[in-house]
Amino acid sequence: MLNRENKTAITRKGMVSNRLNKFSIRKYTVGTASILVGTTLIFGLGNQEAKAAESTNKELNEATTSASDNQSSDKVDMQQLNQEDNTKNDNQKEMVSSQGNETTSNGNKSIEKESVQSTTGNKVEVSTAKSDEQASPKSTNEDLNTKQTISNQEGLQPDLLENKSVVNVQPTNEENKKVDAKTESTTLNVKSDAIKSNAETLVDNNSNSNNENNADIILPKSTAPKSLNTRMRMAAIQPNSTDSKNVNDLITSNTTLTVVDADNSKTIVPAQDYLSLKSQITVDDKVKSGDYFTIKYSDTVQVYGLNPEDIKNIGDIKDPNNGETIATAKHDTANNLITYTFTDYVDRFNSVKMGINYSIYMDADTIPVDKKDVPFSVTIGNQITTTTADITYPAYKEADNNSIGSAFTETVSHVGNVEDPGYYNQVVYVNPMDKDLKGAKLKVEAYHPKYPTNIGQINQNVTNIKIYRVPEGYTLNKGYDVNTNDLVDVTDEFKNKMTYGSNQSVNLDFGDITSAYVVMVNTKFQYTNSESPTLVQMATLSSTGNKSVSTGNALGFTNNQSGGAGQEVYKIGNYVWEDTNKNGVQELGEKGVGNVTVTVFDNNTNTKVGEAVTKEDGSYLIPNLPNGDYRVEFSNLPKGYEVTPSKQGNNEELDSNGLSSVITVNGKDNLSADLGIYKPKYNLGDYVWEDTNKNGIQDQDEKGISGVTVTLKDENGNVLKTVTTDADGKYKFTDLDNGNYKVEFTTPEGYTPTTVTSGSDIEKDSNGLTTTGVINGADNMTLDSGFYKTPKYNLGNYVWEDTNKDGKQDSTEKGISGVTVTLKNENGEVLQTTKTDKDGKYQFTGLENGTYKVEFETPSGYTPTQVGSGTDEGIDSNGTSTTGVIKDKDNDTIDSGFYKPTYNLGDYVWEDTNKNGVQDKDEKGISGVTVTLKDENDKVLKTVTTDENGKYQFTDLNNGTYKVEFETPSGYTPTSVTSGNDTEKDSNGLTTTGVIKDADNMTLDSGFYKTPKYSLGDYVWYDSNKDGKQDSTEKGIKDVKVILLNEKGEVIGTTKTDENGKYRFDNLDSGKYKVIFEKPTGLTQTGTNTTEDDKDADGGEVDVTITDHDDFTLDNGYYEEETSDSDSDSDSDSDSDSDSDSDSDSDSDSDSDSDSDSDSDSDSDSDSDSDSDSDSDSDSDSDSDSDSDSDSDSDSDSDSDSDSDSDSDSDSDSDSDSDSDSDSDSDSDSDSDSDSDSDSDSDSDSDSDSDSDSDSDSDSDSDSDSDSDSDSDSDSDSDSDSDSDSDSDSDSDSDSDSDSDSDSDSDSDSDSDSDSDSDSDSDSDAGKHTPVKPMSTTKDHHNKAKALPETGNENSGSNNATLFGGLFAALGSLLLFGRRKKQNK
C-alpha cells in the first residue's frame, strides 16, 4: 500500500511498552491482533526533543524551525468489551500503534481492564555514559573551513537528551539553512564535547528509558584536532571517492536480543509481546563517506507496523549535538534489510560509537500457530545474534458452541483530512472452533457507549465486507494473517443476508453452518480533528440454543508535535551517595541515595531556576541553564542521615560539596555538585530477670531468664529485629540509627510480669512488657524487664434446668449435660472450651490471677432463665455470658440456668372482595393457601395450608423472630398491606415477620382478591388517502396477522383481523406487551402517530403497557404503493414547487384511479405540472409541436403524457399532443403557474377544471386548477367532460375544483392529460430536460429496495410511456379541439 499524499498516518500491529517516545501511544483493546513494529534509528531530533507526549502541542513558537505533526495510538488494557451474556472477553490482547516521523509502534490487545497504559513509539536518545572515550573530530586545516573544537569533559551525565530543553529564539539564516522539512534534521546548538562514551552504560541508560527505541551516537572524547592525516589532506584538494562499499567487516557490535513478556503473562504472544534489541556499535576509522553497513533480521521478525505508510519511519542517524546526519537509512522490506550509508561525518570524526535500543516484533505470518523454540535473529554488520521463544496465542472466545476472534489488521488515520480521513481493516473469525451451528448471526458494530469519541464507522456507503468460508481441514492463522487465496469467497451469497443497522452496525445472517468463516471488514474512519480520538469495533456471534459471545478491538490515538530551535543551555548535575566510611570521598562500593531534593538558584538574583529529585542511583540533572554562577542546595535528606565532611581530597568531582555550594557554568555542563551522607549506628538493650520476691527491682541473688523473645519496632510499629536473651538473660540490638524505638518483651511461659519502674534506679527496675527506647547520639542499654513464676487456680460451677423459671437452683432441679462452656481472657481470646458432665458440672483449671469471661452456649430447645435472682450468688444464674475474677484463689460461683418454652404463631388468609386491605364481616377465608415458616436465616422450618375457613397455625415454637411467607393462590392478587390501624384485621402482605416473645403470636394474616383480566386490540385499516388517520370512509383490512409478545419477548398470542379489520387479545394481566402487525403483501405502512391516539397509525411494532384497564387504541394503517413514478416527479413541474404540493395531487391518486388515466395519477402530479405549465410556457413543450403553445397546459398535458419526460419536452413531444390539448389556454396556465399553487390541484380535482377551458386564464386565477387543470380539460373530456366543461366554463375554478374533485376522475378524464400528467411527473425531469425512467424498485417491510421484474430496458420503457402518453394526449386534444369548434360555432 502506498503512502497517500504524505499524510500523517497511524497504524498498529505489535505491542511494545516504548516510553519516552516522540509519539505517545494510548490503547484500548478488545481482541487479538498480529504484531508488526515501528522502530527507527533516529539518533535524536537535534533541537527538537522527542518526548513522550500525553497531549498535542498546539503550536510551536515562531522561532521553531521545524515541526512534526503526528498521530499515534496508545496501548489500552481493559476488560474485554465482550457481551457474551458473558458480556466480556477474556485474555485476548490487542496492540496499538505509535507513529511519528521517526517511529511507529503497533499492536492489538484485548479489552480486559479498563485502564490506559502509555505505549510510545521509537525515540532516539543520546547515551549518557561516563567514559574515557569519545569520538574526536578528524583534523582539518583552515582550507577545509573546519573550526569545531571539542573540549575534554568528564563526569556524570544522566539522561542527557531526555532532559534537554531549549529556549526558543529566532534562528539565524545559517541555522535555517540547516533545517529540513523533516523534524529529524533540525539543528541543535550543543557542542560535541557534551557526549560521553561508554558502551555498557550506553545500553543500560537506554534500558532506563523505559523500553524506548533509541539509536545513540557517542562522539569523540578528544578536544584538540588531530594532526592532519593523509586522507584529510587529500580531501582538501580533491573530492572524496564516490565509490561506496559494504563495510560490515569494519563494524563491530556488542548485541543482546531478549524476548520481553510485556504483560508478565508468562506466555509469549506475537500480538502483545516483543523483542528487545540492544547493541553498541563501533565504527572503524577506515570507514569513509558513502560506505554502508547493514542490519538484517530473520523472517520471524518485523520492524515496522501495520500501516503501509510506516516504512518512511526508518530514520537517519544523526548527531544530537549539532543535527548532522551521520548515516542515511534505506529499508528493503522484501529482504528484511536495513542499509545505513555514512555521510562525510565519518571523514571528519574518529572513534564514532553508536548505541541502539530497538523494540522489534514477531511476524505472525511466519508463525501461524503455537510453536516452541521459534528462532529470532538480527545481524548487525557481520555479527549475528539469535534467541528463541515458545509462541502461544490466546484462545478464541467461546460460549457453548459459539466461538469468535477478531483483530485490527491495518489502520491508516489521517487526522484533520476531510477528503481522506483514512481507513482500517478488521478480521473476524466466525466459528473458528468449527462447530455445527443453527441460525448463526454475526453483528459487527463500530460502537461502544464508553467511547463516545469513537471514529470508526460502519455503513453501506463506506464499508466493504468480504466473507470467506474456511475449507475443511484448513488451519486459521492465529495471528489473523489471512491468505484469502486459500479460502472460498462466498460474499455474493450474503447480498440479501447483510443488513446495515443503527449504531454503526452491520448484521450478517449465516443461517445453519458447519464450518468456520472469515469476515474481513474494510471501512473508513470518520473525519475528526480530535487530538485523542478512539477506535472501537465489536463483533458478536449468536446462534440457536447457544449463549452469544463477543470480542472486539480498540485503539486510542494521540496527536503530538515537536520542534524548536534555541540558544545553547547547559546542565548542572552529579550525585548524592552514602559515604559509608565517612571520609567525604566517593569510593567503590558506596551507593547512591535517591529521593533527595536538589534546588538550583541563580547566585546573583537568588532566583530559583531549577529543581530535581535524585534517582534511585543517586544521580540528578537540572537542564536549561545558561552560563553563570549557581547555588546548589540539597534538602529532604533521608531520615537519620548526616552530612559527610566537605571538600575532601583534590578531585572536585569525587568530593562532597556539602548541603549548599556555588558552582559556575561556563560554556559547558558542570557535573560536579555532589553530596555525601552517612548513617551513624548505635546499640540498644539490657536484661531480663526472674524477680523472685516480686518487688520489681533486680536484686543480687536474682538470675536472668534465658530464651525470652525481645522485639524491636520503629515508631510506626513496624518490626525491625527480633532476638532472644542469652544464658544470662542479656539481649542487644545493634547497628541502629538515632531515633525512637519500641521494645516488646514476650512473657515467658509460666511467668507473670513483675511491677514496673519500682525504685529510683532506672538500670535496676523493670520497664514492663512494652517500653520506649531513645537513641540520641549514644547507645541505650537501660531497657530491662522482670518476671516471676505464675501460681495456678480453678474456675467453674454448674448448669441446671430451671423448671420453675425462678432463676435459682432448687434441690429438685437437675443439671444439664453436654452444655458447651467457653473461657476467654479480657481481650476476648478463647483460652479453653469444655462441656458440662452428666451432672451439669464444669471446671477450668490451671488459671492465673485475672479477669475472665465465661460464655454458656444455650442448649438446643432451651431458653436462659432470669439472671441474678435472690442474694445467694452460689445458686443463682449468671446468664449466658458473665465475668469471673480469680484473685489468689479458685472461683466456683459461675453457673447458668435454662428452661424449655414453646409457643404458637398464625392467623388467617381471606378474600378481600372490596380490596380495602381490611377483613370485613362478610369476607370469607381462602382454603388451601400454602404458608411457610422460616427462621431468621431463611431456613424453612414448617409448611402448612389454610383450612376450609382460611385459618393456619404453627405450633411448638420457641421465642424468636420468624418469617412467614404466603403463596399467592391461583387467580388471586395480594391486597394492600397494613390498611387501617387494626393489626389483627389488616393484611401483612406476602412476606412478613413475626416475633414470639414469651407468648403466642396470632396476628399474621394476608388478604387476596381475584385478579382482574384485561383486553387489548383495535383495528387495521386501508388508509386510501395515506394521511395516517382513520377516515370514516376507509375500511378495515381482513386477515392481517397480529402477534402479541410479553415483556420477555415471548410470543403469547397470535390472531388475524376479522372482516372489518378488527382484532383483540383477551385475558391479559397488567404489564408490558409488544404488538407486531405483519404487513399485508403489496401494501405499504402508512404514516404513524399523526393525530389522536385512537385514530392514527401506531406502526408495525408497538410497545404498550396495560395498567388496570383495557387498551383499544393499538391500530395500524396501510395503503397500496403507487406504480407510476411519473407522478411523484411531477414536482418538477412544481417547478414552482407548488407542484410539490401537487404531490398532494399525487395523493389524489384518485386520479390515478381513474387510471385509464391512471396516468391521471400523474395528473395529480400534473397539478404540479400545471405549475409546470407555467413552465410549459417554457414551452419546452412548445417544442412539442405548435401545441407547445397549449403547452402551458400541454405541460400539464405533456406531463400527463409522457410521464416520463413529458415535462421533459422530449415527452412533450408526445405530450406535445397532450399539450396541444391544453394548448388552448394552457399558456394562460403558464400564468397559472402562479397556480403552482396548483397544489390546490393537489386535489388534482381542481385540475379537472382544466383551466384550459377556462381559457386557462380563468385557470390562471384558479391557478389551483391551472395546474393540471389544463389537463383537466382533457379531463373534462374524459369523464363527464360535461363537468370538465363546466369546469372549463366555470373557468371559475370553483367548478373546476368541484369537478376535479367530483371525479377526481376529471383527472382520469384528463387522462390524456393524465398521461401527460404522468409525464408531468416526468416533467419534473422534463424541467431538467431528461426523460423520466419508470420506477424499477419497490420497498419491502424493511425499507429495502426490491427490484421489479424487468420488462425491457429503461429506454424502451421510457419510450413506450412516451408513446402511449402521446397517443392519449393526441386523442384528448382531438376531443377537446372538436368540442371547442362546436362551441365556436
Swiss-Prot record:
Q: Which Gene3D superfamilies match?
A: 2.60.40.1280, 2.60.40.1290, Immunoglobulins (2.60.40.10)
In the record, biological process GO terms are: cell adhesion
Motif residue range(s): LPXTG sorting signal: 1348-1352
**A cellular component term, taken from the record's GO annotations:** extracellular region
* Disordered: region residues: 54-162, 200-224, 856-886, 972-992, 1077-1361
Q: Which residues form the propeptide?
A: 1352-1385
Extent of the signal sequence: 1-35
Pentaglycyl murein peptidoglycan amidated threonine, modified sites: T1351
Low complexity biased stretches: 205-214, 1081-1090
Query: Which keywords annotate this record?
Result: Calcium, Cell wall, Peptidoglycan-anchor, Repeat, Secreted, Signal
Per the Swiss-Prot or TrEMBL annotation, the motif YSIRK-G/S signaling motif is positioned at 23-34
Query: Record's Pfam families?
Result: Big_8, Gram_pos_anchor, SdrD_B, SdrG_C_C, YSIRK_signal
Q: What is its main location?
A: secreted
Q: Where is the composition biased (Polar residues)?
A: 62-71, 94-109, 146-155, 860-869, 972-981
Q: Could you tell me where the Acidic residues compositional bias lies?
A: 1091-1101, 1118-1324
Q: Can the keyword Signal be found in this entry's annotation? A: yes
State the protein's purpose.
Cell surface-associated calcium-binding protein which plays an important role in adhesion and pathogenesis. Mediates interactions with components of the extracellular matrix such as host DSG1 to promote bacterial adhesion to host cells. Contributes to the resistance to killing by innate immune components such as neutrophils present in blood and thus attenuates bacterial clearance.
Q: What NCBIfam families does the entry give? A: LPXTG_anchor (TIGR01167), MSCRAMM_SdrD (NF012181), YSIRK_signal (TIGR01168)
Q: Which PANTHER family match?
A: TOL-PAL SYSTEM PROTEIN TOLA
Q: How does it assemble?
A: Interacts with host DSG1; this interaction increases S.aureus adherence to keratinocytes.
**What protein am I looking at?**
Serine-aspartate repeat-containing protein D
Native species: Staphylococcus aureus (strain Mu50 / ATCC 700699)
The upper taxonomy is: Bacteria, Bacillati, Bacillota, Bacilli, Bacillales
